[in-house]
């Protein structure tokens, strides 16, 4: 009888120990989860804009989407027209087709490029209505994920030298941050011309 009681007591002790350990582990997990939440930086519009400005800078978006003025070290983005796209109208000079077979041609502001696709002009990315002022976030992400003009399913493809296949690899949060930043920029009123077909550019 004593052995039976001792065995029952041992089983009861083990059961209490298991429950206690389980509760302790659950409490530790809850505390760790709580600490993680406390340590996470909340995503705010201000932090997204800051992140977007950083991404636009390191991705070199100003290289093509900001027209240039001549500085002491050469062309530099015009601070009054940042991200306003191509100024100056479409290409008018005729180009030797043999040259296009070997090179891509750029204007001095690097906002216009000529190649086998014709002439392409850098888009206005500022917050103005002539830029992306009326765009939705979904449009913006769709444009860069699928390479579609204005993010429209039936739109024409984005033309070189826009490196959208590279940008498409960014995370959704990165693209949303870039969009938030662009929407916060100074509006630059500038309607960029549509692409010029190659046949209109080559010398006959």
Regions flagged by a language model, labelled:
Residues 33-57, 69-75, 94-95, 134:
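Electrostatic cytochrome c docking/interface patches
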Residues 49, 62, 155, 161-163, ...:
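Interaction-mediating elements
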Residues 17-20:
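C-terminal motif of bacterial Sec signal peptides marking the signal peptidase cleavage site
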Residues 134-149, 164-194:
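C-terminal capping alpha-helices of c-type cytochrome domains
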Residues 70-141, 158-171, 201-204:
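Gly/Gly-Pro-rich "capping" loops immediately C-terminal to redox-active cysteine motifs
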Residues 52, 58-68, 140, 178, ...:
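The canonical Cys-X-X-Cys-His
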Residues 1-9:
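Bacterial N-terminal signal peptides that target proteins for export
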Residues 22-24:
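Bacterial signal peptide processing site
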């Amino acid at each position: 009888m004593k052995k039976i009681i001792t065995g029952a007591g041992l089983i009861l002790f083990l059961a209490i120990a298991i429950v206690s350990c389980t509760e302790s582990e659950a409490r530790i997990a809850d505390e760790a989860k709580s600490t993680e939440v406390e340590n996470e930086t909340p995503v705010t519009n201000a932090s997204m804009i800051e992140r977007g400005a950083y991404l636009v800078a390191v991705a070199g978006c100003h290289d093509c989407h900001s027209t240039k003025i001549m500085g002491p070290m050469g062309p530099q983005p015009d601070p009054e027209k940042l991200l306003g796209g191509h100024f100056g109208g479409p290409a008018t000079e005729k180009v030797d087709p043999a040259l296009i077979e070997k090179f891509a041609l750029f204007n001095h502001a690097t906002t216009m490029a000529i190649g086998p696709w014709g002439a392409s002009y850098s888009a206005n990315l500022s917050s103005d209505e002539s830029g992306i002022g009326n765009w939705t976030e979904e449009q913006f992400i769709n444009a860069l994920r699928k390479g579609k003009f204005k993010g429209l399913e039936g739109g024409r493809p984005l033309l070189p030298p826009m490196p959208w296949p590279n940008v498409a690899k960014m995370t959704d949060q990165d693209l949303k941050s870039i969009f938030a930043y662009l929407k916060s920029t100074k509006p630059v009123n500038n309607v960029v011309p549509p692409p010029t077909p190659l046949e209109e550019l080559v010398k006959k």
